[in-house]
């Protein structure tokens, strides 16, 4: 019986993983980088929507449906929040085409033949969209709260005020990776998930 391997397998099984054998151990013992999706760091229930502010005479239900359609299309962090807001009815989701991600800014897509953006103020400004003042933003951003904007056809339609919670289980595993000096590569379509946020939330080194 390979006792060390057995102990490792038992520990990993609690996280839904396993070691296939000593060959796998030898193959991965020199790993120095781990790639993970943002959903792995902020699992279901980690993101809280505090409020929605609508603009441009837009119907808030249409804004939510646009956001839900895009988040489901890209499996975004906010997917479950918006699905819950439409009662989990995926049949009413709109067709989403030509999705593009702008690094550290957000997403652009075609929905119902119109250009829809969801992301940061930076993304909106890249598309020359008129924005609420930063003083207006400050009324809603306090503590760890963040903002994402939704725009449709060149106009801001909604502002979402969000916060992100950490997971104790994820924190433990990231601590193991950090102590072993394993680099973390995070794939995210949410501009609020940055190196600085991960470092602040989980104590994982930025470099």
Give the label of every model feature segment.
Residues 1-37, 67-70, 177, 206:
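Hydrophobic alpha-helical transmembrane segments
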């Amino acid at each position: 019986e390979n006792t060390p391997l057995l102990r490792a397998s038992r520990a990993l099984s609690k996280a839904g993983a396993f070691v296939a054998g000593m060959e796998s151990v030898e193959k991965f013992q020199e790993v120095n980088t781990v790639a993970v999706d943002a959903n792995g760091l902020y699992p279901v229930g980690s993101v809280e929507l505090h409020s929605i502010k609508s603009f441009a005479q837009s119907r808030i239900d249409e804004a939510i449906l646009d956001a839900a359609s895009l988040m489901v299309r890209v499996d975004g962090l906010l997917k479950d929040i918006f699905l819950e807001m439409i009662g989990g009815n995926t049949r009413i989701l709109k067709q989403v085409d030509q999705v593009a991600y702008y690094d550290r800014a957000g997403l652009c897509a075609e929905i119902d033949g119109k250009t829809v953006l969801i992301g940061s103020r930076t993304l909106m400004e890249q598309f020359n969209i008129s924005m609420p003042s930063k003083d207006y933003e400050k009324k809603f951003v306090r503590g760890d709260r963040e903002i994402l904007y939704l725009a449709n056809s060149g106009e801001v339609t909604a502002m979402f005020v969000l916060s992100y919670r950490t997971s104790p289980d994820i924190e433990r595993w990231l601590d193991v990776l950090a102590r072993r000096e394993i680099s973390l590569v995070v794939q995210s379509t949410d501009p609020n998930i940055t190196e600085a946020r991960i470092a602040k939330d989980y104590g994982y080194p930025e470099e």
